[in-house]
């Protein structure tokens, strides 16, 4: 009897242990399955957020910018933007280096250069490009930059380039100051190089790659992350639930996706070009090289009479080009009077009782750095944030000024950012009440140059929605957009941050925010028109002019 009872008790114990083991295995499987779930949030035609989930391991390459549901109006807008930019590059097949554009044998001619021009007159320049065999080219697609300038006056303005797709270009300038005015034209990239840049933009969105650190206890793993990940490995999906902005990381082998703690730039892919393609990207040969004039490269401009000057100012419409010009190193917008904030007290008076939000990349972080350096009463609080990353905060308690900076969400090329600090601008805007004492400035462009244009269009679409909502609930909120700017280029930098890429982004930004009710700081023209070398982070004199323009929107001259 006791023997049977002992056997029954042993059997029950074994059964209980077995049930516990099965339960643990099932819980583990459920947790593992949950971390492998690939989910995405899309936007339907009504503008509402629609969430979809696919349970299981993603085995196919996933590019988040392809997974969009757009309204018919959004689709038309995107198609129009892409068509306008893509048609600039002719498809002529492979071209040997000797038949590519040679800036040293190309030339420009000032039309009617012997005539005297008045301030406000149009100046036309004809550019003829030739190859390295000194033969005229029969197609266009070269990326040119042009400006007029008077060094002694520290004056400058940009020109509008028109490509006739036959090897000839025209540059149109508006002469905006009197005196001797010189013309400068540069070849940024030959059309053959532009075709390579376009291929990289479409086929190599991962040429700048990112990583994340995952950690749990003593176990840590690092995996690659991006908007688009190649291969068949399982993914962690970090797509934003509110905006639908896609972001993915390869799943760690041992850790769950929820253990991600940091985001950082991994590096730049090498070996992107063939030997033949590399010839189109040579410093001192065909990257940002001057094109010389055939004949005079300057004209004489005489002042207008006072009555003519008043008529000229009245005739300037909303589509004024250029938007402004430098004179004595001060930017002069053509559509309104810009104030000069030369004294810290002027800035303090303007920003008194205001909350200023700066969102975006490192080019708008320069604004935060300038203000906290120039205005002594703006005291920066140490939030323990990583250098150059943020978030940053400065306060002037006496005058009730609050200044904030926060970087935009991925892709962001900073060294290390805690994953919980990766905030999308659209989400931040949705949390702002707004009002007459609220100022918002946004600069989102420099980290999108390596991606297909659809990625940038999507980001701006989300930001635009949030801006419209903010202005609807608080119409007196001041919203300012800082545009892209030109920068220094070399053979390698051109493949990632070319001015041609940034010109595309700048064009998209201007069109998408046209008519929205925001102010524009034209950093693009303010960089190109200045005599200083181009830099991603412009020198202080240019930043100062940007801030003067920004503050003039916040505190305009009383009329």
Curated annotation (Swiss-Prot):
Q: Which residues are glycosylated?
A: 26, 237, 346
UniProt keyword annotation of Secreted present: yes
Domain of life the protein comes from: Eukaryota
Report the protein name in the record.
NXPE family member 3
Task: Tell me which species this is from.
Answer: Pongo abelii
Q: Which family does it belong to?
A: Belongs to the NXPE family.
**Where in the cell is the protein located?**
Secreted
Q: Which PANTHER family match?
A: NXPE FAMILY MEMBER (PTHR16165), NXPE FAMILY MEMBER 3 (PTHR16165:SF9)
Q: Which UniProt keywords apply?
A: Glycoprotein, Secreted, Signal
Keyword Nucleotide-binding included in the entry's annotation: no
Any matching Pfam family: NXPE4_C
What are its GO cellular component terms?
Answer: extracellular region
Signal peptide residues on this chain, from the entry's feature table: 1-30
């Amino acid at each position: 009897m006791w023997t049977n009872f002992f056997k029954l008790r042993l059997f029950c114990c074994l059964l209980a242990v077995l049930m516990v083991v099965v339960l643990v295995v099932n819980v583990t499987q459920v947790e593992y399955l949950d971390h492998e779930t690939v989910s995405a949030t899309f936007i339907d035609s009504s503008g509402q957020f629609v969430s979809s989930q696919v349970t299981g391991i993603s085995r196919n390459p996933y590019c988040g910018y392809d997974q969009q549901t757009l309204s018919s109006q959004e689709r038309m807008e995107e198609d129009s933007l892409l068509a306008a930019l893509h048609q600039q590059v002719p498809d002529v097949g492979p071209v040997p280096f000797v038949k590519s554009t040679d800036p040293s044998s190309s030339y420009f001619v000032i039309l009617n250069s012997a005539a005297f021009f008045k301030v406000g007159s149009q100046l036309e320049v004809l550019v003829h490009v030739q190859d390295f065999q000194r033969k005229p080219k029969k197609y266009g697609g070269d990326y040119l930059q042009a400006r007029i300038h008077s060094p002694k006056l520290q004056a400058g303005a940009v020109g509008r380039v028109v490509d006739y797709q036959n090897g000839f270009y025209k540059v149109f300038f508006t002469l905006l100051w009197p005196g001797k005015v010189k013309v400068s034209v540069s070849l940024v990239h030959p059309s053959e190089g532009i075709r390579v840049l376009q291929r990289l933009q479409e086929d190599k969105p991962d040429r700048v790659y990112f990583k994340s650190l995952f950690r749990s206890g003593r176990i840590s793993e690092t995996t690659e992350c991006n908007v688009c990940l190649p291969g068949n490995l399982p993914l962690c999906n970090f797509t934003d639930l509110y905006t639908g902005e896609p972001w993915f990381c390869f799943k760690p082998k041992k850790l769950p996706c929820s253990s991600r703690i940091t985001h950082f730039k991994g590096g730049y892919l090498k070996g992107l070009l063939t030997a033949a393609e590399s010839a189109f990207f040579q410093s001192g040969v065909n990257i940002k090289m001057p094109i010389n004039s055939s004949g005079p490269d300057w004209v004489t401009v005489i002042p207008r009479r006072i009555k003519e000057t008043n008529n000229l100012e009245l005739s300037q419409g909303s589509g004024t080009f250029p938007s402004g010009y430098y004179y004595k190193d001060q930017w002069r917008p053509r559509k309104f009077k810009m104030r000069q904030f030369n004294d810290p007290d002027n800035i303090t008076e303007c920003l008194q009782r205001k909350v200023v939000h700066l969102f975006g990349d490192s080019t708008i972080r320069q604004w935060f750095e300038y203000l906290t350096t120039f205005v002594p009463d703006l005291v920066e609080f140490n939030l323990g944030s990583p250098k150059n990353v943020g978030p940053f905060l400065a306060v002037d308690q006496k005058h009730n000024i609050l200044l904030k900076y926060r970087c935009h969400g991925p892709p962001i090329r900073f060294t290390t950012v805690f994953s919980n600090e990766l905030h999308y601008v659209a989400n931040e805007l949705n949390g702002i009440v707004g009002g007459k004492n609220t100022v918002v400035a946004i600069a989102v462009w420099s980290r999108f140059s390596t991606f297909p244009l659809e990625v940038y269009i999507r980001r701006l679409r989300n930001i635009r929605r949030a801006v419209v909502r903010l202005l609807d609930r608080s119409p007196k909120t001041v919203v300012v957009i800082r545009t892209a700017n030109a920068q220094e280029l070399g053979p390698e930098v051109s493949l990632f941050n070319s001015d041609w890429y940034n010109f595309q982004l700048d064009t998209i930004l201007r069109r998408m925010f046209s008519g929205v009710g925001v102010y524009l700081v034209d950093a693009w023209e303010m960089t190109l028109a200045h005599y200083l070398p181009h830099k991603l982070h412009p020198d202080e004199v240019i930043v100062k002019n940007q801030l003067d323009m920004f503050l003039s929107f916040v505190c305009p001259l009383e009329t």
